[in-house]
């Protein structure tokens, strides 16, 4: 289920009518996006079951990586425009049953959300982009660019932004009112009873003037000291990376195996020179070679003719195996390290920026300084010598990636779950939803098992239902029934991975 900000941003983009505009999902991004700001997109996810599709604003702009220029770059402002998006839904139902006992139930439900905002569209004209491309990269290359090169990131530039002109309040409220009556014939007459239940939920979010609701981007391509701002998203930012996809055509006639996906490979990854890979790329595409170098869930499987293997992303067992392997590695860390991780992640859950900073440091394999809870994790990892024979950062990054797939509201609920120590019960409940429905692309009704709901109790159940609702499932506290939605599969998978690894840390 999209957040309030994401829902309004998507509706605004539809109203503007531009397919190239990307709606903003997170509040943190809305505060950092500006014209010329550089965006970072990670190359691959560590999971086969979710992806990090968001473009993350970095703390730099084009001006920070290029040689200074005396020319003044202008922008074109279109607007102001006024946009109002208000939706009110009301539902009413009545039901009566008479099987010796007369029972009647009536209910009303209403949903009300929306906003009213003023915005303008700020665009960088093409001639200004051409002026940028005439400037050279700073020498020496900025350190953050070196970090992005090491990670294999793709970089983009914001060229158009939809900005708020005034402060705006987004609101969301829902209510459910249920009235029930019962009549029972007894020996001396008729007994009657009735009850009523009312549930109201309200949320509000204030957006500050200048925040960006949507944006357009172009690919940043770096060749030696020159830059290119391109409309082609298929290029790599750092052109010295070697693309395995470039080798596929050359190897097609020589190999009987098929790759499930393409991977960008740096020649140093396999201790091979770039010359070796260019001269004999087929040696690096054999099933035997890939089996030894790709993760288990990405390995190539060649079946005899006539046999069909179910795609791994449609089998819940593959997700379980993937998560289990990460838990097994995480469990090798000392209890002290796991304790620090648990409480540090708990402290960072309400700060998406802090989580992203920790991921950046871990991906760089850097011993650089980081303040706060993230720094505590890095320091503890450096002090601990029990992991000389395995890479402890892989399961940590896997956990952080899974957390980052979830919404800011889910982060709040996760923090409550960690404090109440109900992670195991939640993990079992999520598993009970995913396991029977994982392979189905259509809507299927399901009922949550009472024995899985009972241990959560009232407050824990409300927290858990909130986590499920944010994944895209329609949940009601008074009703264990819901309907499977394939759009909920990815966030539910990320939630399952998050709960599983956090539970390992909790019980260490």
Curated annotation (Swiss-Prot):
GO cellular component: cytoplasm; cytosol; plasma membrane
InterPro entries in the record: Gasdermin, Gasdermin_pore, Gasdermin_PUB
One of the protein's GO biological processes: pyroptotic inflammatory response
Induction and repression of expression: Expression in induced by STAT3 and CD274/PD-L1 in response to hypoxia.
Outcome, altering residue 402 to D: Spontaneous pyroptosis-inducing activity
Alphabetical UniProt keywords: Cell membrane, Cytoplasm, Lipoprotein, Membrane, Necrosis, Palmitate, Transmembrane, Transmembrane beta strand
Post-translational modification, as annotated: Cleavage by CASP8 relieves autoinhibition by releasing the N-terminal moiety (Gasdermin-C, N-terminal) that initiates pyroptosis. The cleavage site is unclear. According to a publication, it takes place after Asp-240 in response to alpha-ketoglutarate. Another paper reports cleavage by CASP8 after Asp-365.
Effect recorded for residue 365 to A: Abolished cleavage by CASP8
Tissue expr: Expressed mainly in trachea and spleen. In the esophagus, expressed in differentiating cells and probably in differentiated cells. Also detected in gastric epithelium.
Disulfide bridge partners, by residue number: none
Domain of life from the UniProt record: Eukaryota
Site feature (Cleavage) residues: 240-241, 365-366
Chain positions covered by the region annotation Triggers pyroptosis: 1-257
Molecular-function GO terms, alphabetical: phosphatidylinositol-4,5-bisphosphate binding; phosphatidylinositol-4-phosphate binding; phosphatidylserine binding
Protein family according to the UniProt entry: Belongs to the gasdermin family.
Entry comment, domain topic: Intramolecular interactions between N- and C-terminal domains are important for autoinhibition in the absence of activation signal. The intrinsic pyroptosis-inducing activity is carried by the N-terminal domain.
UniProt name for this protein: Gasdermin-C
Native organism: Homo sapiens
């Amino acid at each position: 289920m999209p957040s309030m900000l994401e829902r309004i941003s998507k509706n605004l983009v539809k109203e503007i009518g531009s397919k190239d505009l990307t709606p903003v999902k997170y509040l943190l991004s809305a505060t950092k996006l500006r014209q010329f700001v550089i965006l970072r997109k990670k190359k691959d996810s560590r999971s086969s079951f979710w992806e990090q599709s968001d473009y993350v604003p970095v703390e730099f702009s084009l001006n920070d990586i290029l040689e200074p220029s005396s020319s003044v770059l202008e922008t074109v402002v279109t607007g102001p425009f006024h946009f109002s998006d208000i939706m009110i839904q009301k539902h009413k139902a009545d039901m009566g049953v008479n099987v010796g006992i007369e029972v009647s139930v009536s209910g009303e439900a209403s949903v009300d959300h929306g906003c009213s905002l003023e915005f303008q569209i700020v665009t960088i004209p093409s001639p200004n982009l051409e002026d940028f491309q005439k400037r050279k990269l700073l020498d020496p290359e900025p350190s953050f660019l070196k970090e992005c090169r090491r990670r294999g990131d793709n970089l983009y530039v914001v060229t158009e932004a939809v900005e708020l002109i005034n402060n705006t309040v987004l609101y969301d409220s829902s209510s459910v009112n249920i009235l029930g009556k019962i009549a029972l014939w007894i020996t001396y007459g008729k007994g009657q009873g009735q009850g009523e239940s009312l549930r109201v939920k309200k949320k509000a979010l204030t957006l500050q003037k200048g925040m960006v609701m949507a944006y357009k981007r172009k690919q940043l391509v770096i060749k030696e000291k020159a830059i290119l701002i391109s409309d082609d998203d298929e290029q790599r930012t750092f052109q010295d990376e070697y693309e395995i996809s470039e080798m596929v055509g050359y190897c097609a006639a020589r190999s009987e195996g098929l790759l499930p996906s393409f991977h960008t490979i740096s020649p140093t990854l396999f201790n091979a020179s770039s010359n070796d890979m260019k001269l004999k790329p087929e040696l690096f595409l054999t099933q035997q070679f890939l089996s030894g170098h790709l993760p288990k869930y990405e390995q190539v499987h060649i079946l005899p003719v006539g046999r069909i293997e179910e795609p791994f992303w449609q089998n819940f067992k593959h997700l379980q195996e993937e998560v289990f392997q990460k838990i097994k590695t995480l469990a090798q860390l000392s209890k002290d390290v796991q304790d620090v991780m648990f409480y540090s992640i708990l402290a960072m859950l309400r700060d998406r920026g802090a989580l992203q900073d920790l991921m950046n440091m871990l991906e760089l394999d850097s011993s650089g300084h980081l303040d706060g809870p993230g720094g505590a994790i890095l320091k503890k990892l450096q002090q601990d010598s029990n992991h000389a024979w395995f890479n402890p950062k892989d399961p940590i990054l896997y956990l952080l990636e899974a957390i980052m797939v979830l919404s800011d509201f889910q982060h709040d609920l996760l923090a409550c779950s960690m404090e109440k120590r109900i992670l195991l019960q939640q993990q079992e409940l999520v598993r009970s939803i995913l396991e029977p429905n994982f392979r189905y692309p259509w809507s299927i009704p399901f009922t949550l098992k009472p024995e899985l709901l009972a241990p959560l109790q009232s407050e824990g159940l409300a927290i858990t239902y909130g986590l499920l609702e944010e994944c895209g499932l329609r949940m009601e506290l008074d009703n264990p029934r819901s309907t499977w939605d394939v759009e909920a599969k990815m966030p539910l998978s990320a939630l399952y991975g998050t709960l599983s690894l956090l539970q390992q840390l909790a019980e260490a």
